[in-house]
From Swiss-Prot:
NCBIfam families: rpsB_bact
Protein species of origin: Acidovorax sp. (strain JS42)
Protein name: Small ribosomal subunit protein uS2
Gene: rpsB
A GO cellular-component term linked to this record: cytosolic small ribosomal subunit
Any Pfam family: Ribosomal_S2
InterPro entries, per database record: Ribosomal_uS2, Ribosomal_uS2_bac/mit/plastid, Ribosomal_uS2_CS, Ribosomal_uS2_flav_dom_sf
Length: 250
């Protein structure tokens, strides 16, 4: 689960955006600038990332759900891969407005997706070629839009977002509903309203991979710890002294 300063350096987490695009609210996390590019202070980023991991780990240990969001081209595959590894829902294509604030409607779409999958497995022989084509197109669209959240039965307990500016609608919906946010914030965006800020590069594929892997590791570790605790509790109960009662003693 641990991420080192060296790993952050190698992934280019410290490279911010051009100085002319900076957001002054990120000043506490900026070390300086080089060639008109802001350099993010990794001595701040590392402990803040570790804090975000700790939160994700505790949440997972308490059976909470974290929704991973990364729809930028360089993040899609990495986010989907790590979310699947951790067994959590994810959004990797586009954020549909109302995905959280109008979750009731989204659940209807999820049901439609699951019904269509079951229908496909049963066979589409009764449909005409044209009907099959229309069916396939609808299924493909639903899979693309909500495939990553099809097993999310309720609103998530937290959201992990790579690039809070790019995903401002997701951030806004989470804030409105009081859902805690873990967010990667680059030098050109504001960290305000983000519960667990990770100051860092949100464009580099290597940096994105590091964040996604780190959060997925924390989730898996939290879940594993919870299982271990349950096993210990069961073992402790089972070790209580067993006294056999002689039924003939009376």
């Amino acid at each position: 689960m641990s991420v080192t300063m060296r790993e952050m350096l190698e992934a280019g987490v410290h490279f911010g955006h051009q100085t002319r695009f900076w957001n002054p609210k990120m000043a506490p996390f900026i070390f300086g600038h080089r060639n008109k590019i802001h350099i993010i202070n990794l001595e701040k980023s590392l402990p803040m990332f570790q804090e975000a991991q700790k939160f994700a780990k505790q949440l997972a240990a308490n059976r909470g759900t974290i929704l991973m969001v990364g729809t930028k081209r360089q993040a899609r595959e990495l986010v989907a891969e790590q979310a699947q590894r951790a067994g959590v829902p994810y959004v990797d294509q586009r954020w549909l407005g109302g995905m959280l604030t109008n979750f009731k409607t989204v659940k209807t779409s999820i049901k439609r997706l699951k019904d269509m999958k079951a229908q496909q497995e049963a066979g589409l022989e009764s449909m005409s070629k044209k009907e099959q084509l229309m069916f396939s197109r609808e299924l493909e669209k639903l899979e693309k839009d909500i495939g990553g959240i099809q097993d999310m039965a309720a609103l998530p307990d937290a959201i992990f977002v790579i690039d809070v500016g790019y995903h401002k609608i997701a951030v806004s919906e989470a804030k409105k509903l009081g859902i805690p946010l873990i967010g990667v914030v680059d030098s050109n965006h504001s960290p305000e309203g983000i519960d667990y800020v990770i100051p860092g590069n949100d464009d580099s594929a290597k940096a994105v991979a590091l964040y996604a892997r780190g959060i997925a590791d924390a989730i898996l570790e939290g879940r594993a710890n919870a299982v271990t605790e349950v096993a210990k509790a069961v073992a402790a109960e089972g070790s209580d002294e067993f006294v056999e009662v002689d039924e003939n003693a009376a």
